Amino acid sequence: MRPSENLHQVSIDLADGAALAAWLSDTSSPHGRDGGGLLRDFLADAGKILLINNAAAVSPNAVSGRQRPSEILSAVSLNVAAPLLLANAVLAARPALVPLDILHIGSGAGRKSYAGWSVYGTSKAALDHHARCLAAEHHENVRAACLAPGVVDTDMQAQIRASDAAAFPLKGRFVSLKNEGGLQTAADTAAKIAAYVESERFGTEAAADIRDFW
């Protein structure tokens, strides 16, 4: 299967909110032609559009007062600003009435309070609310959801286990999950996410949990 001639690959740091915003709106962006124009070209002949916002940072893994300011800023830019900017851009660029599905990958940390995750949890809660607001706006042929994927064995988990226990009280819990085989594989989780996106249940609730389906 050959990729569309309208496909252009762009390398951009999603944690740099200013750079992403400039690329989406400004033809003078150092990343080349403006992203808004590229999106319109890419989506021009689309029969259906799917946007998945998965990129995220879990740092700072630390209680308030022990967090690095740079990590707070980076996490909010990557976890919140980037998904909102991309969702807004795709909504603006999609051809009229073409079906659009927007999936944010959320977290149980956005729905329950955990010591040491005031930044990560807050950022994931923001995506839950963004999905709710999209539903409240009643965009025609648009479905949106924020899905908590469960606890998955990824590099993010390794980063959590490497955190400072004195600053992150939950470190021991995640070390135990790894040692006791309590983590889902990335491949199994990806397959479940794909099945969820293709199901009739996608978009019926703004904040969903993959463990409620399997």
What are the functions of these language-model segments?
Residues 45-49, 93-108, 140-143:
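Active-site loop of short-chain dehydrogenase/reductase
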Residues 99-126, 131-139, 148-152, 158-161:
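Catalytic loop of short-chain dehydrogenase/reductase
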Residues 4-18:
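Rossmann-fold cofactor-recognition segment
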Residues 15-43:
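Conserved Rossmann-fold cofactor-binding substructure of NAD(P)-dependent oxidoreductases
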Residues 28, 47, 57-73, 92, ...:
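Conserved mid-core segment of classical short-chain dehydrogenase/reductases
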Residues 146-149, 154, 162-214:
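C-terminal helical subdomain
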